[in-house]
Structure formats: C-alpha cells, structure tokens
Amino acid sequence: MAQQPPPSRFLGVTDLSSLAVTEDTVLVTLQERYISHKPYTSLSPAALVFLSPYSHLPIDDEESLLHYVEEYYQCNNEEGGSRNEQGWWKKKMEQPHVFQLALSAYYNMRRTGQDQVIIASGPTGSGKSELKRLAIEAITQVSLANPGKKGSKIGLQVSSAEFILKCFGNAHTLSNDEASRFGTYTELQFNERGRLEGLKTIVYYFERSRVSQAPINGERNFHAFYYLVSGAPEEERNFLKLGDVSDYRYLNCRVRRVGVDDRHRYSQLRQAFKLMGISSRLIAQIFQLLASILHIGNLRFSPSDGIQEGASVINVETLDIVAEFLGVHSESLAEIFSLKTVLVRKEVCTTFLGPEQAEQVRDELARTLYSLLFSWINEHINTKLCKDSFGSFIALVDLPGIQRNSGSMGSFNSVDQFCLNFAAEKMHNWVLHRVHETTRQEAETERLLISRVPYFDNSECLGMLSNPRGGLISVIDDLSQKKRSESNLLESLGKRFHNHPSMSISPQGNRSSASFTINHYDGPVTYSTSNFLERNANETSTDIIQLLRGDTTSRSQVSTTEGHGSSNPFIKGLFGMKNIAMQTHPRSDSTIVAAQQSVRPVRAPSTRRKKMMSLVPVSEEGGEETSDFQVGGGNDESYSSKELHCIAGQHWAAVDSLLKSFDQTQTWYIFALRPNDSQLPSQFDLRSMKQQVRSFGLVEMAQQLQTSWEVRLSHKEACERYNEELLYRGIPEGTGDVERLRDLKRLMSLNDADMGIGLQRVFLSHDLFRFLEDRLRAKEPGEQHAYEDLGHRKLQTDPFSPHRYQPTSFDSQDHVYKDPSIRPVDSSANLPLMEHAQPIVNSSLEIEDRESSAAPYVSYGGRSITDIEGYASSRDLLASSIHKSEKDPLDTEPQAGETTEVYRESIARRRWVWLCSILTWWIPGFLLSKIAGMKRQDIRQAWREKLAINMIIWFICGCAIFVIAILGPVICPTQHVYSTNELASHSYTLDPNNAFVAIRGEVFDLSQFAPTHLTAVSVVPTKSIMQYGGLDASELLPVQVSALCGGVSGSISQYVTLDSTNTTDVYSQYHDFRAFTNDSRPDWYAEMMIMMRHRFRVGFMGYTKKDLKKMAAQGKAVAIYDNLVYDMSNYIRQNGGGLKAPDGVNLTAQDQADRQFMSDQVVSLFKYNSGKDITTLLDNLGSTIGTDVVDRQKTCLRNLFILGKLDTRDSAQCQFSTYILLALSCVMVAVIGFKFLSALHFGSVRAPESHDKFVICQVPCYTEGEESLRRTIDSLCKLRYDDKRKLILVICDGNIKGFGNDKPTPAIVLDILGVDVNSDPEPLSFQSLGEGAKQHNMGKVYAGLYECAGHVVPYLVVAKVGKPNERQKPGNRGKRDSQMLVMHFLNKVHFSAPMNPLELEMYHQIKNVIGVNPSFYEYLFMVDADTTVDEMSLNRLVSAMRHDKKIIGVCGETSIANAKQSIVTMSQVYEYFISHHLSKAFESLFGSITCLPGCFSMYRLRSPDTNKPLFISHGIIQDYSENRVDTLHLKNLLHLGEDRYLTTLVLKHFQDYKTKFVRHAYAKTVAPDSIKVLLSQRRRWINSTVHNLAELVFLDQLCGFCCFSMRFVVFIDLLSTIIAPVTVAYIVYLIYLIVHDGSSIPTLSIIMLAAIYGLQAMIFIFRMRWDMIAWMIFYICAIPVFSFLLPLYSFWKMDDFSWGSTRLVVGDKGKKIVIHDEGKFDPSSIPLRSWEEYENELWDQESVHSGSYMPPKAEYSYDYPRTRSTYSHGGYAYGQPIHPMQTRSTSPVSSRYQMSQFRQSPYQSPYQGPYGGSTADFRSSRMDMAHRPSLDDTSSFHQPYQPAPRPQSSYAFNLPDPSSDSFTAPAVDYLGAQAITDSQLERSIRKICANAELDKLTKKGVRKELEREYGVELTERREAINRLVEKVLTE
C-alpha cells in the first residue's frame, strides 16, 4: 500500500497572522487551503481572506450554516488544559468562514450594542456579492423572531429585497457572471433585543450607461430584461409585444449563462415582489416599463427632409407601443427625438436633431427610465423595511472593485469606471488607515506598544484625485460645468499633474486615442477623454422630464400635453422623486431649463445619535433591555432640487459621507480574491494571486493584525461587567480597577494581544471577549433556551440562492401576507413617490401602528385605499390595461388639461363630408383605428377625404384614359382586317419577316407557318412556301364540299366539287385529298384550317362597302351577312357546283341533283341584293325554308363562299374617334401656343426710373444658415433704391437652431446686423396663430442701421421667442403667422386700431427711432431668407405698380442659385424658367397670376388714389388669419401652400385688380438638392396647387373672354396637374407601341410633342439663353419623375402632415367639438391700446422746454425694471453714439407702456411677472423723412459724429396683481372721474364682486369702494357703474 504524502503544515493554518508572515508563506497557505476546497482563511478574528472557488461548495450550504449557528449559541465554556498554558481558555472553533465572521459581528453587536460594519473588498468577479448574501443569511438565522411571531418573516423580505436589486442591478460580464453594476451599503437594523426589524439599502453609483449599450460579445445587459423576455407568460408577452432576446438591440448578445434558467428566475422575481408586498398592478407597471425600455432601444431614425425638420422615426409601430406604455402621445414622444430644447441666455431655444443625435436621446430616455426605476425599487424597499429609529445595526458594504475595460471589444473606461474606481481607491485607503493607523494611534494614546508595520499607502494617489483645491475631480467638475472640450481637459490635466507619479497623460495629437492614466492601488487604468466631460455633467434631457413629469406648478394656467406629463401615474411618479434636481426658467417656474438625475443617494447611513458606547446590560428573562441611546436617521438626505452637480463630485461627497459614518462602528473585513483570471475552479494562478496580495497589502495587514482588539471598555465598566469572573479568579473588589484587570491578565496567562490595559480603557481580543461573555451568557436563561431550541428549529433558508435551481414552493409562506408586520403596498399604481403625494412613512413604523386600520393609506390623487390586493394571474394583472387599450382614448371625453370648443360646420363642409362618406363607406372605421392606427376621428376623416379626393382624381384620370385609349375602340372597335393592298405589302419581297397569306377570306402569318411546313414536308423548301406571301392561296387548297357543307337536305354527294372547272394551283395536287383522288381524306382541309386558325391566323381580308358596291357593279354576287362578306358569283354562274368521280364510278341522278347544294332562296338573295347586307333577309328565311335548312346554308356559306370581313375603318364613328383626340390635343397645343405668344417680347431692357415710394422688405426666416441669411440681407441692402425709403424687416419665426448652425436663427440675424450681443430687450406679447393659449406669443424687437457696400439701410428685427414655458420650437407659428404679424400691424396702422405691446414697440421703433411714420409705407416686398435679389429688381417691381394703378401684386423671375449642385437641381432649372416665361407670362396677359411666389413678390398695401386698403384689408386678413385649420382642405391651403392661397385671396377679394409678372425683375433662390427634400417640397406644391385652383374655379367674374377666360385657363391648369401621370403614361405607351409592337409611328402625336417643346425652346432661343438647351434635356429626362411619380406620391400623401394634439369630433346637428390641450386663449390677456391715445397721453404728461427733456413722474407706486430698445449701427449697441440720420429739436415723443390703461382680464394674467418687461422714458432723434425738403439728400447719413440722447423703450407685459399689497391705484383726482375709462371700472368691479358676499353687495357699496380705490368722486359716473355692475353680475 502506497504511503500517503504527509499533509502540508500550511493546510492546517486557519489564521495568517499566526504564521511567520511573509509573502511566500501567505501565498502557499492560501494555495494549499484553496486546493483543499477551503477558500476561507483568517487574517484575524475580524478579517477574512476568501478565494472564489468558481463553483458551489458544500461548506456554503444550510447544513454548514447550522454548525456555525450552533457555535454561536454554544456558551458552556469548559475549562481545560493547564492554567499556565497560553490560550487554554480559547474555544475550539469551526474553520474560518463568512458565516463565522458575520455571526461574530452580530455577537459583538449583541453583547456590546455597538454598530458593526462588514466591508468586502476585492476585484470584480471575486464573489463579494455572494459573500454578502451568505453573511446576511447567517445573521438572519440568529436574529429572527420565532416562527409565528411578529417579525418572523422579515428574513424572507430581506432576501427578497436583495434578490430584486440583484435582478435589476447585476449583469453578466466577461469577468463575472454576477457582476454588480452598483455599490451597496446594506444596513440590517435590530432592536434592543437583537431582533432583526429593518433593512436599509443605499446604492452608490448605479452604472446606468449599461442599459443603452449594446452588449459586447460575452456580456449581457441587466438580468431583469432577460428574465422578462424569457419568462413572461404568453398573455403578458402578447400585451407587452415581446419577442425573442435577439429581437432587441439592448439585449442582442451571444452568451448564455451556464446553469441559470431565466424563465425560472422570472418566476422567482415575481415571487420576490410578492414577498415584499408589492401589488399586482405595480408589478405590471414595472414589467411594462421594462418592456418599454426594450422597445425604445429598437427605435430607428431617418434623416430629415432638410434643415427645417428633425429626425423622424422609421418604425412608427414601435413608437406607438412605447408611447402607449409611457402614457404619452406618439407625436409628443416623437418630438423629443427630433427637437432638443436648450436655454440660450434667457430664452428657450430649439435645435434640430439628426439621426445620430436622436439615437443619443433614445438611449438617454432608456437610461433615465431604467435608473429611475431602479431608484424607485430601492426606495420602495427602504420605505417598506427601513426604520427611523432602532437599537443598533450591522452594515455590509459592497463596492465594485477596480474596473478595467480593455477597449478591445469597443468598450473603454470613462466616467462610470472612474467613479467606481475612485470609490474603490477611497475605500482601500480607508481600510489601510483603519488597520494600520487607527489602532496604532489609539494604542499610543493609551500608552500601549504596537509595532508599526511599513505598508504601501495610496494617499498620494487619493489626494491627487480628491483634493478639494485642484484635485482631479475638482478639475473635471469645473471643466464639465463650463462645458469645455476634451482638449481643454487634457491641457488642464497636463498643467496640473504632468509630474505626478500617479498620473500620466497621452499626447493630444490623436483625438480618438486621447486619454489619461491613473495608477490605482490595483494597477494603472487608462481613461478615454471621449465625451468624458459631457458624461460627467450628467445632464438629463429637460424634454424627457417635461414630457413624462409634466408641469406640477399649480399656478400654471397653460395646459399642454407636455404640461401634464404622462397619463401613467407610475411613470409620472418616477420623475417626482428626490434624486432629480431641476432648474427653472427665471421668468417661469413651470419651465424646466436644466435637469439632472443625481448619483448621490437620497438616504445616508444611520448614525448613533449619542456618541457613546456601553455594553448591553445583562437582563433577566423576559425583561426588556433598554439603553440610553438610539441609532437611526439618514433617511432624508435630499439636497436642493435646484442645484446641479457633476457626477464625480457627487460621488466623491457620497463616498466621503459613507466612510465618515463608520467612525463609531466596529469594522470587519473581507478580502475577496480571484485565484485565476479564467474563472476556472481549482486553478490557482500564482502570478495573479501575488499581484492581488501585494495590491491589497495582505502581508502587511497580517503582520499588523497580529495584535487585534475588537472590544474597548473603560476600566470601571470592565470590572463591573466581569466582577463575577474576577471574584471567581480570586481577585477581590477592594483593589483598584486597573490592578484587578492586571491580576486577571496574569492569572489567565494573557498576553498583550489578548488584553491591552491602557490609561483609560482596556482592549480585548474577540476570543477573550467571547470567553468572558459566554461565561455570562451561560447564566442567562434566554440564551440557554435558544441553544436548547436550536435542535428543534428549522433554519429559514434563502429561497433565492443562486444554487437553488429547483422551483421553491412558497405555499407554506402564504400566511406572510397575514403578518401584520408586512403591509402590502397600495394596490393602485398611483402610490409610489410622487410629488405632492409622498408615501406616508410613520416615524417609528411600530408594529402596533401597522396593525391599526384606522389610518388608511393616502394614495396619489387623494384616494383612500385600505384593501389588500392579492397576487393575480397574468390575465388579472393586465386586465385593466388591456381593456383600457381597447378603448379609443382620443374619441372619449376631454381629459385632464384639455379644452373643448364647439362651433358649427358650414353647409358646404357638411355636403363635402357627406360625399366623402358615400365614396368611402366600404371602409369600416374600425379598420382605420385598429389596423391603420388612426386613433383620432379627425385623422380618420382626413384620410377618408384624402381617399375621396384621390378617387375623384383617379376618376378624372380614368376619364382621360377612357378618352385617350378606350373611347376610340368603343366607338370604333379594332378590326384585324387587311385590304388587298395591305395584304400585298406583307409579301416575302417587301416584308420577309411578316409575310401574310390569305386562304378563303382568312389571313395567316406565313412567316411562322413556313418552318412548320418544312418540318412536315422536307422536300418543299421554305422559300417556295414564302413565295405565296401577300397572295390569296385559296386555290392551293381544294376543298371536299361534302365534308364542309350539308346542302339543303343535310347530305350531298361526295363527288360534288366547288367549281365545275379545275382551275386550281399547279401545286394544289399536293393538297388535293378529295373523293375522286387516290388518297381521299375528306376532313383534311377542315382539320388543317382549325389548326391554322388557332396558331397562325392574324385576321381577315377586309372589304369596305365601297369595294362591295364596285364588285356588284361588275356583276358579282357579293353580300354581307353578320359583317362577313360572301361571294357566290361562280356558283351562280355555274348553276351549282361541279361533279367529278374517280375512274370506274358512274354518277347517279342524285349526284347530279346535289350539284345545286345551295337553296334557291339563298341564291336569290345574292342575286338580287348584291353589294348589300342580307343579314336580316337571310335570318328571315327560317320561316320559309325552315331554320334547319338556314343553319346548314350558313355553314356552307362560311366554309365555301367567304371572301372576308366588312372593313369599317373609314366609317364616320371611326373618324370621329380619331379627330376628337386630335381636337383635344390641338386645344392643349393651342394653349401652349398662346403661352408662347404671350412670352414673346422683343426689345432691349430699359432702366427703370428712381422712385420715392416707401417699401418694406419683409424677410421671414426659420432655420436658414448664416451664409444664406447674409446673402439675402446684403442683396436687399444693395438694391438700387433709395436707402431711406426701404426698411428691411426680418421676422425670426421661433428661437430655433437649424442643422449646421452654432446658434439660434435670431442670434445669427442679430450678428449679421451688428447688434450688440449684450442687448437683450424684454419679450412683448402679441397674438399669433395657434390652438388655444398658443395664440399668446411673445417677441423681441430690435432696430438700427445696417451698413453694407456703401449702403446704410434701416432694419427692424422681430424675433418670435414664445412664452417661457414653450419648449418645442418656442415662438414658432409658421411663415403665415410671420406674414400675419406684419399685415395685422399695417392694418392697425392704417385704421388707427388698438395695438398689442409688440405692435406698439414696432410702431415706436419705426416712427421714433428709424424716423418714418409706418403709414408712409405703400408696398410690401416679400423675400424668403434663401433668396438673393437682383439690384434693379425692386425698382422694376415698383415701376410696374406705378405704371398701372390696378396692379395689386407683382412678381419677377426666380431662377435657381444652386443649379449645378446635384442632378436634382439640374432637372429643375428648365422647369423654373418655363414656369415663369410661359405660365406666368400667359396668366399675366389676363392680369390674374394664380400664384405670386412668397420668395419674390410685392403687394400694394393701399390704393394710391382713394387710400383704400388692399393687401391689408380686413377681408384678406380675416380669411388669411384663419386659426381653425382642422380639415384636409384647410391644411393644404394654409399649411402647405400659404403663398399661393394668399394670391387666391387677393384674386377673390379684389377681382378688379391685377396680378402681374415682371420678366425683367430677377431673383435667385435655393432649390432642393436631394430627392427626399424635393419630394417634400413638391408634395406641398402639388397638393396646394390642386386645392387652390379648386378654390379659383368657383370664383366669379374672372377676367377673360369666350372660352379663353381665366376660369378656363385655371381649369386647364388644374386638369393638366391632375392628369399629368396619365399624360406620361400615354407617352410611354406610344413609345412602347412603336418600339415593341412595331406599330406605325403616330406622326401627329410626334408633331404635337415637337410643337410643345419646340415653342418652349424658341422662348430661350429668342432670349439667347443657349444654356437652357442642356437644362431642357435634363428636364425631359426627369419628366417621369416630375409628371408621374411626384403627382402620384403627392396625391396619396395629401394628409401627411402633423395634426398636432388637437382632436376634432363631429357632434350632432353639424356641430364640431374641438378638443385640445393648449388651454383657452383669452384675448383680453393681451392688452391693446391705440397709438394715438398712447401718444396723446404722453404729450399731456411731458413738459418740453427748448428741446430739453424732463422725465415724467411715475403714476404708480411701483417701478418697472428698465430695459432699452435695441438700436444699433454696425457693431454699436443702442445707447452708444451713432451717426443720426436727422437730428431734430422738436418735441420728442416718449415711449412708455402704461399697462394699467390697457384692456385686460379682470383677473391677473398668467403671464404677468414671469413674462414681464419694463417701461422706460426716452427722447428720440427721429428720421422723420416725410417732412424733409429734399428726400433724396443722403448727406445726413455721413454727418460728423454728433452725440445725442438715445431713446429707451420697451413695451413689456408685467402687470401687478390688483389684489396684492403693492398695487396702488393711479392718482387721477386732478383729471376728474371722466379720466377713468370704463374698462378700468369694469376691472375694478370684477375684483370687488369676486371678493364680496353677493347677498350683501349693493351698487352704492360698489361705488363707494371704487371711490376709495381711485380717490375721486364718482357720482357723475353712477349710471356707467350701475350698468357695469349689472353686466358683471349677469355673466
């Protein structure tokens, strides 16, 4: 027998500190024990080293745990051994284990009352989280109440809580199957008796970035996703729209966890939620949110159509699913992916997002939702289990180890890894100092000797990281807050740390590899600087917050979709938690401008409220243990919600706070190591282990911990507690405490490591403390009973152990829900952590309070719910959601925050809807709502209207097709007949490939037949056969008469022949198989004809009636029967057929009689009706000779006498079908011809004269770039027109930043014009187009002089910035609104109507700053922001207006500026040219151009003679300012083609006026350069053209004469637009006929096409535009696209535009119910005041002396903030010296806005205060050009510098609250009662009535109150007051 090797001496070592500690001995010991399946080794009683076995070991089972529990309870110390032997008192202990360490910590806490902390340190993948689970399992076994008692089930809840966090926070990585992606502080809370009663879990830095990162090979996302996808039941999967794991971008990985069943884990997760008391509805919400995140990850985006739109979602179905689950509208959700809201200075700005940026927002949304869900789950668990006060706690700290991504698989180290590594570095430093420094310093204080062990201290690295002044974290946070770049980061780090040993920086040359490296205690880690600062800033999208959280400010009166947030209270509640910090707009608390999800925990570790420690006194059985201190707090660590901090700084503060909380605790250490990097069991990598031992300093720790004291007591306390032991050892009480303790140490043979006696305290090792305490425990009955009951008690195992794969039965645990200590959460989904509805947490959470049913829970929304909802099946779980989804939420009653408006439909509208219903009745509504996803009724109605219009268009196109292709064949059916000449043309000589031959009236294709004949008869060459081409070969094929004709009786002799003479073809003998031949085949001819008719027949011989008459005149017996021509001439001439019998056969009399096989009556018909149609006559013979005879005779005629068919191709109906198309074509060509004639103008271009008319050059801009805007503005400035008489008016439609722009459009415009960047006037209110409260808009006004190329031109900029609470495209209301702003303003100027604040500011800037009265302007010149105008164009347009006073609008020629940019632009050049020089020139003949392009046109504002308003008339403004755009027709008119519709309105309201085309006025614009943009543009143009022309057709009195009226031209234009696809298709068909079928060339059609394009070509030839030849070729090649594909695409996409959030429901009796979420708009909320009233009042209040200025006295007791109207010249801001255009000393006019005197709402406007502005006084040096002697003198522009006071003006909307104390009525007593307007009185009366008791209110009392308010006698105004009181009370 082989001898066993002796066991190693290191195998039995359980404590490393007991060795002669060296690195080698430590490694060998660890290796020996690890190989022997002993992964645990002690460093000291308070420190443990663990080597992960990478497999499950039996020592971690419940059986092993039971041994350690027994060891804990065992307290009968039997003294053994010699008293002189050192350590004789030590108990024999089990092998080191985490169970032992955890129970020791609990023992220490239980006996001392001191709080304990167990810190687990180690690299990632070393098993720290599993050690924590085992430690908690061990502690819960000894701390739970007995089964059946209160609190006995909290152990299951603790396990459930840990498992839930593990599911949502752990992931599979390359280094760890259960990698924790967050750090945890788990606090087990105990009462004074040591019973577990609470749990607090604090998360330190959750790695939220993993959610949106597609897993690299070998890794997975968070476990919860896979559990849900793999384990959800079928019904839930269907509801949540779940697929396979591979279907989701966030989950797509190639790894499968070994030994883990995701399906089973899902069941365990649900069970854990159940054990936590979470309701079924909340579980459903959690899983629904998980599914939403998965669907979010699958969203894909496509680029926009251009710079004016953001990215769009490709998979709209997925978007709808996400929107439904998140409780928001799909349109609102899609907006956050296309638009981003940022704060630029003080204004909200919108920027467009591309596909890549949209993907970033998508991922941010997913990260935000998941991290908030994780925080909510953790906080929900804490709310459930955490105590506010308790006796003591044991905390377990598990922070991730050093993270080190290799970068080889696409991953790199960034902020996440930096923060986690900093925490590990900080924790390691704390452990080092705790082990080496704290104990030594404590011993030195007590004058005890402990040797100092040198160790590696990482304080230098930590100081470099966390130095508050200049540390790395401080630098990073500072740069992040300043939004600096990556190069700035590297530069700053290089300056500060270039010589630091813990830092190295990579060169800045390669930006992609820019990085810095930190030498951590575990080795160097390289961090990439890519997006490092941006990630550190940790800014959460405010659009996401606003979308899902909504506006929670109660004072906000603006109701929007985003203002209400998610309709799902659970989702909305996530954003109401404390870990979201938000900053609001300075003028609107409801507008979030910055947000951040904090990484700092909302809770903090508990602390001891009295900083003292006392051992727990020994109590008698049943006695209640008490102490004079409590532990708790830290449950509300929320910080200011308006402070935003960076990630690194927050994490630093959180970790620092965590470590500070450990100061008063007893610390226990676990060092978890990785025996190898391959995660293989039983493999010990010596090199890796050596590195870990060194990095953690285990050798030095083992040396230092050779002296380890775990308990510290004062001398007195020790003597009192262990007095019995002292007396037992014979140590009397009389001596001093120190002497007694020294005697005890001597008697027990203790060394200094066991007991250290200091100056004030005595220090005990854990073993000695355990010995002494066990001696006391042995006398405690409670401890004895617990030990005795241990054998009868079953351990409460962890049901969620990773090594417990079998399904755990929880049936026996059902009573857990009856336990009063477990209170289920409110079954409503509204409960969790929502703002204004925080969960109620009792201050003590005592069990007695929980059992009370008198205080119900208060859930979100104020509902009281006291019932406990049990766990439901999947059907019940989602039943409410499923039923809810089946109901159309958009067709129901208005929801919260929505407004309903009712108005009536017009009769025409109702008729149209009725027609649409008739046309589309066959499409059920549920198909549109369920299948097509059209949830809203108005969208479904628009789709039906679109379909109806398309059906009408298709019908018209069908009619055109019918006329073109079908009408001819219907009138003149196609005949396949050939005349003799046509047959002759198909001879072998003339057409060898199409040789035809005729046989008895039928024509056959000889070319195809000949090869088959050669195959059958090879001796006859094909050429011989082809010689018959073009001939009649009837004689070549003799017929057997008896086989083809039955005669009169039904049979005839077989010897009867067709002719009496044998004049057949010489080759007929080869086909003669008649009866008299030797080879008789009676049916051969019939069989051959059947075959040939089927395969080779191409038609018949054709004979016209003229031919028949000619033959009849020649004596032939020919007739027509059933359109077939028959010839019986030979039969009649021969008096029958012939006879021929074979040799030897005699003919009988019957044979002779059978020669007349045709009836005499039939023969007579041919004789006497030759050349006529005998169809009727022959049919009538049936009554005479019998129908049988007639039928047989017809057969004989068809087989023997047929000559061909009747040829009707030259009949009248056929001629009509030909010439009707010709006539229509001629009409079309004639229109082109007239257009050509109208375009012919010869002669040179004359230079226009200079004019003195004032012109406004309006430039609306949206998102154009700086280059485009500068070109446009400069071109206007350079116009050869008097600079003083033109005003450049730029309207910025919204504060939006377009693609490629680095700043918003208003900022670009102001930079171009040279406005000072510091000038920032207050926004002013005005009324815009929009739904509800969207009509209230705000804008800023800037004015000044712009100098360019020697021109100095005044400008006015109106920047529409919107109200501060607008987020998406603030201020943007569309181009039509920009036009309406100017038209409204000029209309009010003309009629002196009251104006809003913005209009008054515009008036002031134009009149008092620029110096021109706005009423002087006569023309409005409209130019788009991408258009450049020729310098002579304005003069030419004005000349046309001056030449003809009846012209109301003119336009010039617009060409393409980017013609050669792409093939798309090239194909448009010729189209632009022809559309102007043909179409517009032709329309201009009639004075009615149907579309004046908005990019280059001019309108007359008023008539020159009568001063009648024209373009600014009420009619045009009223129709054009239609605010209710809710139908398909209106949207196409007002949203897609506003310029064309504006022209339509001009023609409609002023039919006597003209619109003209001025061919010599030029401008260039930018055309679409891509197919996608072109599709978008032409879709708008084509559809708006159709709808506008449809409007024009119904207008009366359009100019013109006869059929060439404008109405006719419009009709032709409309028709040509509609049938354009048919036209192209017909041309293609003609080409196909010519090329493929070989049809004859339609010469006439070719001539017409040549005429059309030839006339067009002549236009540019006459104009010497030779370059147009190439552009014409491009255009012709693109005709299929422009005239076929684009119209078809446009027609079908007619309803493809945003419908917004406005819903339209058709009610009863023609009522329309409009439901929207924009709130109601109160026009009185925008104050109005006429300029005259305002100006007169200012004159009355000011005093002017010799040009001096005296500021007026304020009428109110409060002051407005003073701002200035921006007025600049070049780069100088207003308020600085400029060159004045004219300096006048006349009395100035001040601009001050007295808001109290404007009409306003009786209640305070919601826009007062936050949107307010200021009023200020000014003195102006005006450019009043209307009264100058010489208006052409421009010398004033170049006068020397003359300083002058600058005007100040700002009309702001800042009303004081009349109810506030600061409100003081104006002093009007010097003006009397008449100075008070009725509107002021009404406002005051409303305020009085609102605050008074109506039953006690009297008119006299109201008048007294008014007198008191205004300080004047109001008796003379009594009647007015009484009337106003009655009006107010009756409303």
From Swiss-Prot:
It comes from the Eukaryota. The chain crosses the membrane at residues 912-932, 951-971, 1220-1240, 1615-1635, 1641-1661, 1668-1688. ATP binds at G122, P123, T124, G125, S126, G127, K128, S129. Keywords: Actin-binding, ATP-binding, Cell membrane, Cell wall biogenesis/degradation, Glycoprotein, Glycosyltransferase, Membrane, Motor protein, Myosin, Nucleotide-binding, Transferase, Transmembrane, Transmembrane helix. It is an enzyme of class 2 (transferase). Residues 798-817, 1826-1847 are annotated as: Disordered. In the N-terminal section; belongs to the TRAFAC class CC myosin-kinesin ATPase superfamily. Myosin family. Polymerizes chitin, a structural polymer of the cell wall and septum, by transferring the sugar moiety of UDP-GlcNAc to the non-reducing end of the growing chitin polymer. Produces a large proportion of the chitin that is not deacetylated to chitosan. This is Chitin synthase 5.
